Amino acid sequence: MYRAVTRQIEVTVEPNFVPEQSSADRSRYFWSYTIVITNSGEETVQLKTRHWIITDATGRQQEVKGEGVVGEQPTLAPGERFEYTSGVPLSTASGFMTGRYQMVSESGERFEIDVPTFSLDSPDNKRVLN
């Protein structure tokens, strides 16, 4: 599990390779990832936007920006958490993702929180060491 905390908001990520949606012959590899956002602060916050940078094993990057996550802009009161699962395809057997969420506080302040960088590894990823 990967973890980041920004302004008392914790984001954890658990990636999982999905072999039944992947095919090495077609250079298609798919991962699901489950994210839990926990508000340990003292103020209610709302997730407004997401910004992802997805990098494959060749260094090719894809940038994804959008409103909310999985069609929602969750509001988290102190002590509340929000969990969702999404997915990402790559044309290589490994890669990584990193990102940020834009949040807005109850008082109207906008700020960003980090999503921890997490690794996408498949069983087909052959590493050669000397």
From Swiss-Prot:
**Could you provide one GO biological process annotation from this protein's UniProt record?**
error-free translesion synthesis
Q: Which residues form the signal peptide?
A: none
Concerning PROSITE patterns, the annotation shows:
APAG
* Family matches, as InterPro entries: ApaG_domain, ApaG_sf, Uncharacterised_ApaG
Q: Which domain of life is it from?
A: Bacteria
Domain (ApaG) spans 3-127
HAMAP family (alphabetical):
ApaG
Q: What is this protein called?
A: Protein ApaG
- Natural source organism: Bradyrhizobium diazoefficiens (strain JCM 10833 / BCRC 13528 / IAM 13628 / NBRC 14792 / USDA 110)
